[in-house]
Amino acid sequence: MIQVLLVTICLAALPYQGSSIILESGNVNDYEVVYPRKVTALPKGAGQPKYEDAMQYEFKVNGEPVVLHLEKNKGLFSKDYSETHYSSDGRKITTNPPVEDHCYYHGRIENDADSTGSISACNGLKGHFKLQGEMYLIEPLKLSDSEAHAIYKYENVEKEDEAPKMCGVTETNWESYEPIKKASQSNLTPEQQRFNPFKYVELVIVADHRMFTKYNGDLEKIRIKIYEIVNILNEMFRYLYIRIALVDLEIWSNRDLINVTSVAGDTLDSFGNWRETDLLKRKSHDNAQLLTGIDFNGTTIGIAYIASMCNPYLSVGIVQDHSEINFLIAVTMAHEMGHNLGMRHDTDYCTCGGYSCIMCAVLSDQPSKFFSNCSYIQYGKFIMNQNSQCILNEPLGTDIVSPPVCGNEILEVGEECDCGCPTNCQDPCCNAATCKQYSWVQCESGECCEQCRFRAAGTVCRRATDNDMDNRCTGQSADCPSNG
């Protein structure tokens, strides 16, 4: 059994606050300076890895003490993770770097049930956490005193421009995509798919040549950026019981391998074709995302095909590197992957707890890391009705998933649910003491699902439109049937 290492960091704030400073995230108007002081308590005889499996950080925010719990994201990389870049003469260079002892964590604030966090501890502490409903960012200060860190609210980062940033998707009817086949070809029944809690997306990210030049040919800087983005993606998708495993990172360091243009739809089409004819033949994966340094026409910052996950040509998205804040890039990539998983743009009736949700068509000044209730339903329908077989298999190597810890609000192997400690659990379907669903649970979501049970037969689940009749639940399924 893996020994869990407990690390306490005391962050002592300096007796002053900064008024304005230029950080990696941009110009920050108000920040606190803190100093990490690390105190390690190791069990006797335990070897000390470079990066511990679990850590705690104690510090003050706005004068109030908080405790940040961190747990290493052991599902970040697949066992066969690889990286590819190209020499100046076009030769492909592929390596399998050791990534088991990495430095990327998920976290939460103690006694704050709604808190989340995504932190890298590679060179100091860098990332974000949510405290009492507000997002804070932390990063090392580039001073002669290497221990100094800045903590600041996301709202205090000066916005780069006032122009809206939007998804380029306009088609929201997945049935219009002819190549997508129905789930009748799947080996699993719809009910087996519904109650198989884990889904695994094996992801490839490609950084184009403009990304390479934008970061001055620094491969390590691009790697770190993408690792941080994928770590945040996992934080966002875990509430859908989806794990994102990075299986390959490709950097077009010599030249672009497709025609990357400012017309987002054309670039998406070219990237999908390249994935099917080139990438898939040398690296097995479920989905590929292109991160590009180009500025797309108009307000578009990303685009993807809808309900296309597992399709060789269509399971792709493209994202513009539009911000210095990696969280915003991750929100955009999560949005495009959401389209791949059957999600459409949110309407005014969609909610995720008072925030602008991930599938909002326009990137908000205060973006959320949560999917809306509409997205949950649309994703559920995709799993039931589309050929989603590829995301039902676990990536290579069971050791990429950490041993389950019931009550940490992270769904892990062997658990059917994890809603936190019993006093904080908000999931009526989940037994917080065992992290198993109650034996009487029939469903978790759907228009004909209420309090974990199928709604009674005859219950109206969709009102009539035009000459149609009301749609009514059957009492045997969580889905609202059509009258056809």
Curated annotation (Swiss-Prot):
InterPro entries: Disintegrin_CS, Disintegrin_dom, Disintegrin_dom_sf, MetalloPept_cat_dom_sf, Peptidase_M12B, Peptidase_M12B_N, Reprolysin_adamalysin. The active site is at E336. It is an enzyme of class 3 (hydrolase). The keyword Disulfide bond applies. It holds the Pfam family Pep_M12B_propep. A motif (TDN-tripeptide) lies at residues 465-467. Binds 1 zinc ion per subunit. Residues 403-484 form the Disintegrin domain. Glycans are attached at N259, N297, N373. Residues 21-190 form a propeptide. The N-terminus is blocked. The keyword RNA-binding does not apply. Residues 1-20 form the signal peptide. Zn(2+) binds at H335, H339, H345. The modification Pyrrolidone carboxylic acid (Glu) is found at E191. Gene3D superfamilies: Collagenase (Catalytic Domain) (3.40.390.10), Disintegrin domain (4.10.70.10). GO terms for molecular function: metal ion binding; metalloendopeptidase activity; toxin activity. Belongs to the venom metalloproteinase (M12B) family. P-II subfamily. P-IIc sub-subfamily. The disintegrin domain belongs to the long disintegrin subfamily. Homodimer. Snake venom zinc metalloprotease-disintegrin that hydrolyzes azocasein, gelatin and fibrinogen (Aalpha and Bbeta chains and partially gamma-chain), and exerts a potent local and systemic hemorrhagic activity in mice. It inhibits ADP- and collagen-induced human platelet aggregation (IC(50) = 0.3 uM and 0.7 uM for ADP and collagen, respectively). This inhibition is dependent of protease activity, and probably occurs through the degradation of an unknown platelet receptor. This is Zinc metalloproteinase-disintegrin BlatH1. It comes from Bothriechis lateralis (Side-striped palm pitviper).
